[in-house]
Each structure stands twice: as structure tokens, then as C-alpha cells.
From Swiss-Prot:
It is found in: Cytoplasm. Coiled coil: none annotated. InterPro entries: AGPR_AS (IPR023013), AGPR_type-1 (IPR000706), NAD(P)-bd_dom_sf (IPR036291), NAGSA_dehydrogenase (IPR050085), Semialdehyde_DH_NAD-bd (IPR000534). It comes from Psychrobacter cryohalolentis (strain ATCC BAA-1226 / DSM 17306 / VKM B-2378 / K5). Pathway: Amino-acid biosynthesis; L-arginine biosynthesis; N(2)-acetyl-L-ornithine from L-glutamate: step 3/4. The keyword Transmembrane does not apply. The gene is argC. This is N-acetyl-gamma-glutamyl-phosphate reductase. The lineage of its organism: Bacteria, Pseudomonadati, Pseudomonadota, Gammaproteobacteria, Moraxellales.
Amino acid sequence: MISAAIVGGTGYTGIELIRLLSAHPKVSIDLLTSRSEAGTRADEIFPSLRGISDIVFSDLGDETLATLQQCDVVFFATPHGVAMKQAEALTQAGVKVIDLAADFRLQSLSEFEHWYQQMHTCPDLLKTAVYGLPEVNRAKIAEALVVGNPGCYPTTAILGLKPIIEAQNKQSKQLIESRIVIDAKSGVSGAGRQASLALNYAESTDNFKAYSVEGHRHLPEIEQGVAQLLDSQFKHRIRFLPHLVPMIRGMLSSIHMELTDAGALVDWQQVFEQSYASEQFIDVMPKGLYPDTRSVRASNRLRIAVHQDNERAELTVIVVQDNLVKGAAGQAVQNMNVMFGLDESLGLNFAPIVP
């Protein structure tokens, strides 16, 4: 059995990790930490875990840190800035690290410090950390000691653009114009479990709003992901605008592009179907069908629809996922499976919840 620890088990992604790993046939959760709930059983705080896990929360003290070094893998479901303080000692002990925060997502130290407004305490490890999007970096993840789990918005954006960028790489002519617009909507769980006036029921229900209009910290992550895929001379300008919608979990991103004359000759439906034919967690919808967020609820699946309008020279890609699963905890488990040479679907092969 793989000995796993979860640091920060009281947030929504932490709860999802407990749920997923408790059902994983090759994993044992041997340590669960929380500064605020140390000494309390997890199923006392979250009744949904009754009969699933009775593990007791530990404080993140010196004794716990020593125990972490005895595990095979440590998941950090913590605020930004926590994993970087522990990762070096853990990797030196041979422990694999999967960070669900942003400490190891951005390769650029200056970009991280600009967008997250804190100094990175482990810059050397940042250079070797792998961006944990299996559909893009599977081979590198398999060899990684540290994986930076992607943000929820970048997961939809990068996977929604990947077939287009790869098709562009094979062409001498530009297929889409330089400007890409990503219009994204997330359920309120994406903002976390902490108390917030903006997330109060009376504030967020029956309401729909844009936020971080002047610039969201997931933008450089999206730009980095596109740049890593792109090996042609064509560059793109990305406009990313997130919105908060009155639902608990779920995410929908609409990606809008303008086709060139050469791009209008491409059958983009076929391109997407061929690109993701072997990916078990990505479902390309048949032409004319479009996914909704409920169709992926509580699952690790991501559904994509493609609409090509040659008359208006427009290409629209619609992507949906559960922001807490494929957008967070499920993807972390998928990364763990890759890191340990397991089938990627292990512990994740379950149907979405409907209704």
C-alpha cells in the first residue's frame, strides 16, 4: 500500500482528497493534519466521512513533520506558501510531494512572487518541479518528486486549447488569429471554505458576477501552459475573465477564437476527437451536443464541445469539469497514480452524480 499524508484536511479540496483516497485500493491515509482541528476525528467534523474514515487530525508540529518523512507521498491541500517550506526536507527523505496550491505551478520565480505577493522559499526545487497536467506532462510526472497540481481554471483552458495548439504546430500557416478569449464560470466552492462576506448565502445566491477583471493569478499559469505547448512561430494574446455563479461546484469555460482562412479548412471536431481518443478522463462531445456542469459533478471527467462557424470565422470550445475533482483533488490523485506507475483511473473510475 502507498502510505499517504494529507496536510490541510479541512478545506474543500482536503475533504475531497479524503473521500477519494479512502476508496483507493492501493492507498492508506496514514496522516491527516489540521492546526485548528488537531485531536478531532475527521468524521466528527464531516459526517459525510462516517463509515469511510475515522482518522484523527494531527497538528503540524515537529513530531508530525518527522512522521511525514516516513510516508510515500504527501498531499498539500493548504494555502499558498505552505508546501514550499516543507517540500525540500520531504524530497530529501525520498517522499513524493503533490501541492494543490500554487507553490510549484509557475516556473518563473518573478511571476510567482508578483502574482502571489510572497517570496518563494524553495526556488531550487521550483526549477525541477513538474506541472501536474497528465494529459500534457505524463512522462515528466512519472519521474517527478514534486508536482504542482494545476489550478482549476487553467485545467479547462489548457486542455481546451491543447488540440488547437498542437494542430497549429504542424502547419506553416496560422490557423487561428492571435487573440484568445477565455470566459470562465465557477461555483462558489472554488473560492474555498473560509468565511467571506462575498460568499454568504444572501450575497452569492441569485447573483452572478465577474471578478479579478483587472487580472487573475491563473492567467500566467494559462499563458505558461500555452507557451509550453507551442513550438511554432505564432504567439497568442490571452484575455481571461472569471465569473462566480450561484452553484456549489462545477466550472464551465468558453474559449473563443477567430479562424484564419487556413483554419476554416480544418475539421476541428475531428482534430479534438483524435487528440483525446486515448484519454480516459476527457470526453469530446459529438458534434452539435454541448456539456453542462452537472454532467461531470463529483467525477474526474472533463467534457469538451467544439463549435466551428466558418461563415463568421469563429471557433468556440466549451469545457466543463468539477472544480473540486478534475480541477483539484481528483487530478492530484491522477497525478499520484502516474507517479507510482498505477493505472490512472485507479480510485477515480466512477460516474458523475445525477441529479
